[in-house]
Amino acid sequence: STRKTSWPELVGVTAEEAEKIKEEMSGVEIQVVPPGSFVTADYKPQRVRLYVDESNKVTRTPGIG
């Protein structure tokens, strides 16, 4: 099976709901990124960043990296 690398269907849901990615991918590290936060530019194949707004809703398509 092809490994999923992005989750466009999660835009607009809460970070808590989006953490279901963990059920699809074992060993993945979820990082929630609040508005105005700085993130490193490094790439990690086991990391998914959830960019959220003030309401904790995902604002960008989560993806591997």
Swiss-Prot record:
Domain of life assignment: Eukaryota
Gene Ontology MF term list: serine-type endopeptidase inhibitor activity
UniProt keyword list: Protease inhibitor, Serine protease inhibitor
PROSITE patterns: POTATO_INHIBITOR
Gene3D superfamilies: Trypsin Inhibitor V, subunit A
Family: Belongs to the protease inhibitor I13 (potato type I serine protease inhibitor) family.
Function: Inhibits subtilisin-type microbial serine proteases including proteinase K, subtilisin BPN', subtilisin Carlsberg, subtilisin E, A.oryzae protease and S.griseus alkaline protease. Weakly inhibits pronase E. Does not inhibit trypsin or chymotrypsin.
Annotated protein name in UniProt: Subtilisin inhibitor CLSI-I
Lineage: Eukaryota, Viridiplantae, Streptophyta, Embryophyta, Tracheophyta
